[in-house]
Amino acid sequence: MEPSLVVVGLNFKTSPVAVRERFWMSELRRYEALHQLVRAEGIDELVVLATCNRTEFILWTSDAGEAADSVLRFLTHEYGLKMSDWSHFYRLMDDVALNHIFRVASSLDSMVIGEPEIVGQFKNAWSQAQAAGTTGRFLDAVMQKALTVSKRVRNETAIGNAAVSIPYTTVELSKQVLGELFDKAVVLMGAGKMSESAAKYLMNHGASQICVINRTLHKAQEFSEKVGGIAVALEDRAPYLDHADIIVSSTSCPHYVIEKADAERIQAARGGKPIVMVDIAVPRDIDPAVREVPGVHLFDMDDLEKVAKRNESERQVAAVAAEEILADEAKGFRRKLMAERVVPTIVALRNRLDEVCRQELESLRQELGPFTEDQDQAMTALTAHITQRIAGSLARELKELPERSEQDMLTMAVQRLFHLEQPQKAAAGTN
C-alpha cells in the first residue's frame, strides 16, 4: 500500500464537552500515546494534538485502515472508547487531512475563529512528538508548512483582529449576569495562559480584586504579581471562593474542584447573591450539578461556543481571504508531497538499472576481454547516462501527474515492469 496522511480525532464540532473531556490527554498521557502508537501496525510517524476543544492523531502511515484501527484500539483500551462514541470521531485522509491540518493551525477550525492559542498548542504538539522521536521527514514537513501557512494567514488577513476570544466571552457572560464589573471580586483557579488572558480582560472592564488559586503556590505567586492580585494554594481556596463574584476555572485536575456542596456553601456565605462560574477546563473543573444551586450561573465550553458564534460577520470576511491563502498553499505543498511519495520507487528503479548495467558490463568484459582504463570509464559513464535518462524521464512523469490515483497506477506499473519491491517503509521516511 502507498503511504498516506491521516487524521483521526474529535473536536467541539463533533462532540460536546462531556465527551471531549473523556479523551483529553495531559502532557504525560500524550507521551504515552506517542510511544505506544508509533509501534502499532501501519503507523510510521505520529503527532498527538490535544486541547480543550479537540483530540487529534496526525499520522503518516503505510496502511491507512490499519493505522486508524490502531488508534481506535488504543482509545478503547486506555480511554474506554465505546461503540456509541464512534459517531463523534472522524477519519480524514490525504488532501482532506492536509487541508484540515492547515485549517487547524490557522485557527480557521477553532471554536473562536482567529484565536491565537492554537498556534502555541500546535507547536507544542509537534515539539513533543519530535522529542519522543515519532516524527520523520514527512510529518515534520507537514507541520512546518502548516505553521508557515498560519503565519501567512495572520500577516495577510485580519483574522486575528476579528477574533472573539474565550476571555472576551467570559467578560460578556459575566456582564450579562452582574452588569458592570467595577469592584467585582474575581477568583482565577489555575495559572495558565488562558487564566492570565481572562484576568487582563476582566481588569480592563473594572474588576479590581483578583485572587489566583493554584495547586503550586509558587506559580500562583508569580501569576498574581503580573495581575496585582493575591496568591492562594488550592487546598486553602474555600474562604476566597465564598467572597467571589466571578470564578474562572482552568486547572488540569482530573476531578471536580468545585462540587455542588461547595456551591451551596458559597451561596450561603454570599446570601444567595448571583455568582458567575466560568469553567474553561477540559476535563471540567466544576460539577454541572452546581447549576441547580439558586443564584449560580455556570458557563462551560459549550456555552462559550454559543457566544463565540454570535456576530461572526467580520471574522467570516477575514476567513474567506484566509481560505484562499490556504487553498493556494495546500495546492503547492500537495504537489511537493506527491513528488516525495515516488522518490523510493525512483531510487529502487535507479538501483535496479545500475544492477542490470553492472551485470551486462561484466558479461561484456568476459566476452571481449579486459577493457583499457579509458574504455572502462567510457562504458561506465555510458551506462550511468542511460540509467539517468530512463529514471529521470519516469521521475518527471510520476511527479507531474495531477492526480494521486494516476500516480499510484503508474508507480505500481513501474514497480511491476522492473520487478521492484514495493518500498512501503522507505516511503514513510524517518529522520
UniProtKB/Swiss-Prot annotation:
Signal peptide: none annotated. Substrate binds at residues 51-54, 110, 115-117, 121. It catalyses: (S)-4-amino-5-oxopentanoate + tRNA(Glu) + NADP(+) = L-glutamyl-tRNA(Glu) + NADPH + H(+). InterPro entries: 4pyrrol_synth_GluRdtase (IPR000343), 4pyrrol_synth_GluRdtase_dimer (IPR015896), 4pyrrol_synth_GluRdtase_N (IPR015895), GluRdtase_CS (IPR018214), GluRdtase_dimer_dom_sf (IPR036453), GluRdtase_N_sf (IPR036343), NAD(P)-bd_dom_sf (IPR036291), Shikm_DH/Glu-tRNA_Rdtase (IPR006151). PROSITE patterns: GLUTR (PS00747). NADP(+) binds at residues 190-195. Gene3D superfamilies: Glutamyl-tRNA reductase, N-terminal domain, NAD(P)-binding Rossmann-like Domain. Its EC number is 1.2.1.70. GO terms for molecular function: glutamyl-tRNA reductase activity; NADP binding. The active site is at residue 52. It comes from the Bacteria. GO terms for biological process: protoporphyrinogen IX biosynthetic process from glutamate. Disulfide bonds: none annotated. The record marks 100 as: Important for activity. Pathway: Porphyrin-containing compound metabolism; protoporphyrin-IX biosynthesis; 5-aminolevulinate from L-glutamyl-tRNA(Glu): step 1/2. Keywords: NADP, Oxidoreductase, Porphyrin biosynthesis. CDD domains: NAD_bind_Glutamyl_tRNA_reduct (cd05213). Belongs to the glutamyl-tRNA reductase family. Catalyzes the NADPH-dependent reduction of glutamyl-tRNA(Glu) to glutamate 1-semialdehyde (GSA). During catalysis, the active site Cys acts as a nucleophile attacking the alpha-carbonyl group of tRNA-bound glutamate with the formation of a thioester intermediate between enzyme and glutamate, and the concomitant release of tRNA(Glu). The thioester intermediate is finally reduced by direct hydride transfer from NADPH, to form the product GSA. HAMAP family: Glu_tRNA_reductase (MF_00087). Possesses an unusual extended V-shaped dimeric structure with each monomer consisting of three distinct domains arranged along a curved 'spinal' alpha-helix. The N-terminal catalytic domain specifically recognizes the glutamate moiety of the substrate. The second domain is the NADPH-binding domain, and the third C-terminal domain is responsible for dimerization. Homodimer. This is Glutamyl-tRNA reductase 1. The lineage of its organism: Bacteria, Pseudomonadati, Acidobacteriota, Terriglobia, Terriglobales.
